[in-house]
């Protein structure tokens, strides 16, 4: 069951006109939870999900039964499993080919050669668990808050190409053509904002305009 997010509840109730904190798969789960359609006004940047470790410098060093902390919310749990699969640490069942469409859970792991122990933890708490696990899959924003540099510190990062997890500016269908929303979307997609993201985060946050088609 998906938990309702207060930021989206505020938007649904008309207390705010837009929000900017989530990716599309998460928004879809919120539409289902709230019974409320939303509208995407702009895709702005990607905060790549990363795999981190204080115990190991390479995936080859992982022992049998290694512990892996992953986010416990539905969309980012699935995202973490796809990332682990991309580094051949697990293999999901056939049919799980589209991260934006096919939500995976640990029950959907078909092959787990290292017998990894998947530990579901609230996303903001995962950086604190780094000392206690072999690997931690951490959202980009929480990694940055914890003083990690994703582009340098992660053993593995999500690729930007064809990534469905861009952070988006979200509004309501009623407001999607409002000139103020359209101007905000234009500003967030401007070369100046893209340059600021690139200059400030050095590859740890990627402006959508930098993605390959």
Task: Locate the predicted segments by residue.
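Short, small-residue-biased leader/transition segments that mark boundaries at the very start
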Residues: 1-3
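Short helices/loops that flank or line small-molecule/ion binding pockets
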Residues: 5-19, 32, 82-83, 104-137, ...
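Ligand-binding "clamshell"
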Residues: 29-41, 56, 132, 137, ...
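A conserved helix-loop-strand patch within extracytoplasmic ligand-binding domains
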Residues: 41-91, 194
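Short mixed-charge
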Residues: 90-111
